[in-house]
């Protein structure tokens, strides 16, 4: 297991984890530029390929067990190779499987929502050839966000956020945030309180840095107070702002036939100024087998 993932999981055992963890700056991927390069036209910023993916936890019940789904997910992720993936529902062993399947260039940051390695993670995977983490934090969607495993709003499950501040090694070491979450499936009250807490935390981020929010929000875009709160926090929906879009499907399918034009409950949001070139809902399946009960959503971005 790569060292950074081990460090992340070891730190996740500490109750003080809600305090942001600063990581040492690595000089990997940096090189001195010739003096002449400073006089050249600035390079166009490379696109950042992002994904939000509810993995469906590693269940053992067929016909959609993790053992059956894993090779399909491996094929999908290797084919798409996003630079950053905000995941939901992954269990510890499952995340190690995905890390192996993505290959040696990927790492992840996360902690179990019940604390340590217990229960589901909001793990953020990233391509180390493109991104280096600078700082990360976990907090819980409750009245006591610094307490691992806390759940005070009557939600059906513990809910949390993992966020990471990255350096983009291909874009002049530019920094940006990724915030990843999974809101409650049972309680609208818990979802609304969670969205309000996320909005407050986002307001505390450096306003000069781009922000990408990934998540399963368990409500339809455009038709819920949760969506209004997130956009009221100064975010925009990449599905709406993208220059090009794929076909719309309900992003939760539950292994049933896909629903064209259905509810989009998995979103990728950004601060204004970031350009969304393309947004898509990925319908990949192999011989009728989907990798999850959700469809991953993707956005190709230029941070701004």
Predicted regions: what they are:
Residues 2-9, 14-17, 21, 27-101, ...:
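N-terminal, active-site-proximal structural segment of metallo-dependent hydrolase catalytic domains
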Residues 46-49, 118-121, 158-162, 174-179, ...:
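Residues that flank catalytic or metal-binding motifs in active/ligand-binding sites
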Residues 49-55, 73-98, 125, 164, ...:
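Active-site beta-strand/loop signature of hydrolases that rely on acidic residues for catalysis
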Residues 55-59, 90-94, 113-117, 130-131, ...:
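Solvent-exposed loop/turn segments at secondary-structure junctions
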Residues 64-65, 189-203:
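Alpha-helical scaffold elements lining the catalytic groove of polysaccharide deacetylases
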Residues 68, 72, 110, 148-150, ...:
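N-terminal post-signal-peptidase region of extra-cytosolic proteins
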Residues 84, 88-175:
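Structured beta-strand-rich core segments of catalytic domains in phosphoester-bond hydrolases
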Residues 189, 203-211, 219-304:
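Metal-dependent phosphoester-hydrolase catalytic domains
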